[in-house]
C-alpha cells in the first residue's frame, strides 16, 4: 500500500447492528422526551393512618413544592397559591349555554350579571332565556382533558390528575356520553337547581327546587333537551379530587368555605331557610366564608355542599352493598352497576373514618371520625333499601356537610324540603 492511501475500516455486521439499534433507542428517547414535555401529573397520596386532614396529604409528581390554594378569610379573598395557571383551573370559565348545548357567550368571571366584556348585561337570572348558566371545563385541542387515576397501595390512597391519559389507569369517565363517545368539555351547573314549571334550571336569583323524588328530578332535567341530566357520581368524584389536590387537605370546608349549613326554618313560605341562587355572582371562581350562613363557590359552582342535598346518578346502596356506575346510561335499580367492594350492615350514621380509592372513586368504608379528622364529613346508610346517593348536605346539617358528605339512606321515592337536584350537560357531538 502506497504512502498516503486512505484506509477505510468497516465494522462487522454485529457491531453495525448494535450501533443501529442504539441510535434508534437514542432517537426514540429524544422523541419520548419531546412527547412528555407538555404532560402534567398533579398527584396526592393520603395516609390512612393519619387522622389529621392536612398532614395526611402529601404532594406527588408535578404538585411537589406547590403552594396549596385556600380561602384567605381575614382578607376576604381566595388565594390560588401556585394553582392559578394549572390547566384545569385556567381552562374553566362561566358561560350561558343554550338548551341545544351551544355555548352562547362567556360571562364576566368576576361579575356574572355581565357578559365577558364587563359591560353588557347577561341573562344569568333571566328565566325567559333559552338555556342555563354553566361552569365549563374546556379540554379541547391542546388544552387537555382532566384524566383521573385513583388506587391504593398499602396504607396510602392515591389520586392523580393529568392532562393526558398517562397510562391505562387514567380514566375520563366524567366525559363519557350516553352513546359511549367521549366529549372534550364538561358542563357543570353554576347554581343549584331551580324549577321554572317545566324544567330544572341553573340561573341566579331563583328559589331552589325541593320536595321532588328521583324520577321527577331526572324528568325535569331532561326536559331541557338532549344531553341534560342530573349530576353523576363520576363528575362529583372528579371535582372533589380536583379540590383536594389543589388545597392539599381532606377538610373541604376549612379550605374553601363552610357553605350554608345552618338557617333551617320550618316554614314553606320561607323555603325552609334555603338561600336563593346567585348570592355569589360577584365573587369570582372560588369563594367562601367561615360562617355557616353563606354559600360556598368552587370552579364558578355555587352550593357544591350545604343549603340543599343534591341527588345524583351512578351511586347506590342495595342491601347494604355499595354499587357504582361511572358512565351513562344510569338507572335507579342497580342494573349494570358494579360492586365497589364496600358493604355496610343494618343502618346507621357517623363521621367518616376509612375510605377506599379505586376505579370507582373514593368512597367511605367505615365511620369513627369527627368534624376535624379524616374527611371531616358525615355518612348515613340504610342496608334495608335501595338507596340513591344524596351529596353535600343541607342548611340543617351543620358540620356534617362538605364535599364528601354522603347519604345512602334515602330511596329514589324520598321527597322532602331538604332534597332536590341540579342539571349537568354532556357536550353535544359536533355536526
Residue spans for each PLM region:
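C-terminal, surface-exposed recognition/capping segments
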Residues: 40-50, 69, 91, 143, ...
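A short, polar/charged loop-to-alpha-helix boundary motif
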Residues: 318-329
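GGW-centered surface loops in extracellular recognition modules
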Residues: 34-136, 142
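Short, low-complexity N-terminal tether/leader segments at secretion or assembly junctions of large
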Residues: 1-33
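A generic secondary-structure signal for well-formed alpha-helical elements
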Residues: 147-150, 195, 221, 225-228, ...
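Short aromatic-cysteine micro-motif
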Residues: 124-131, 163-304
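Short, solvent-exposed loop/turn elements at domain surfaces
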Residues: 143, 149-153, 195-200, 399-400
Amino acid at each position: 500500500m502506497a504512502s498516503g492511501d486512505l484506509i477505510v475500516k468497516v465494522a462487522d455486521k454485529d457491531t453495525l447492528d448494535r450501533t443501529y439499534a442504539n441510535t434508534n433507542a437514542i432517537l426514540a428517547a429524544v422523541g419520548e422526551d419531546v412527547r412528555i414535555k407538555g404532560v402534567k401529573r398533579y398527584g396526592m397520596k393520603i395516609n390512612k393512618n393519619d387522622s389529621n386532614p392536612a398532614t395526611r396529604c402529601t404532594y406527588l409528581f408535578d404538585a411537589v413544592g406547590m403552594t396549596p390554594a385556600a380561602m384567605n378569610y381575614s382578607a376576604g379573598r381566595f388565594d390560588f397559591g401556585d394553582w392559578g395557571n394549572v390547566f384545569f383551573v385556567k381552562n374553566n370559565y362561566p358561560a350561558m349555554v343554550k338548551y341545544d348545548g351551544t355555548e352562547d357567550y362567556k360571562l364576566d368571571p368576576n361579575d356574572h350579571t355581565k357578559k365577558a366584556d364587563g359591560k353588557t348585561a347577561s341573562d344569568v337570572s333571566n328565566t325567559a332565556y333559552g338555556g342555563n348558566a354553566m361552569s365549563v371545563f374546556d379540554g379541547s385541542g391542546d388544552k387537555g382533558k382532566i384524566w383521573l387515576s385513583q388506587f391504593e397501595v398499602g396504607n396510602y390512597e392515591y389520586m392523580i390528575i393529568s392532562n393526558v391519559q398517562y397510562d391505562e389507569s387514567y380514566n375520563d369517565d366524567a366525559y363519557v356520553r350516553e352513546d359511549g363517545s367521549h366529549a372534550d368539555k364538561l358542563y357543570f351547573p353554576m347554581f343549584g337547581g331551580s324549577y321554572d314549571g317545566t324544567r330544572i334550571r341553573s340561573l341566579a336569583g331563583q328559589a331552589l327546587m325541593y320536595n321532588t323524588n328521583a324520577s321527577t328530578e331526572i324528568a325535569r332535567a331532561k326536559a331541557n333537551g338532549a344531553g341534560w341530566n342530573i349530576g353523576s357520581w363520576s363528575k362529583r368524584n372528579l371535582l372533589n379530587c380536583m379540590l383536594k389536590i389543589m388545597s392539599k387537605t381532606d377538610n373541604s370546608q376549612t379550605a374553601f368555605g363552610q357553605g350554608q349549613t345552618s338557617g333551617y326554618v320550618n316554614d314553606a313560605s320561607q323555603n325552609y331557610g334555603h338561600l336563593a341562587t346567585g348570592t355569589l355572582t360577584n365573587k369570582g371562581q372560588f369563594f367562601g366564608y367561615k360562617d355557616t350562613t353563606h354559600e360556598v363557590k368552587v370552579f364558578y359552582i355555587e352550593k357544591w355542599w350545604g343549603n340543599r342535598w343534591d341527588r345524583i346518578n351512578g351511586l347506590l346502596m342495595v342491601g347494604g352493598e355499595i354499587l357504582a356506575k361511572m358512565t351513562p346510561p344510569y338507572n335507579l335499580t342497580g342494573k349494570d352497576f358494579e360492586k365497589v367492594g364496600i358493604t355496610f350492615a343494618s343502618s346507621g350514621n357517623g363521621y367518616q373514618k376509612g375510605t377506599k380509592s379505586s376505579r370507582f372513586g373514593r368512597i367511605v368504608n367505615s365511620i369513627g371520625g369527627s368534624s376535624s379528622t379524616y374527611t371531616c364529613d358525615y355518612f348515613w346508610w340504610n342496608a334495608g333499601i335501595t338507596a340513591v346517593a344524596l351529596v353535600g348536605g343541607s342548611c340543617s346539617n351543620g358540620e356534617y356537610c362538605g364535599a364528601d358528605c354522603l347519604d345512602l339512606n334515602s330511596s329514589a321515592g324520598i321527597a322532602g324540603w331538604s332534597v332536590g337536584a341540579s342539571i349537568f350537560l354532556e357536550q353535544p357531538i359536533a355536526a
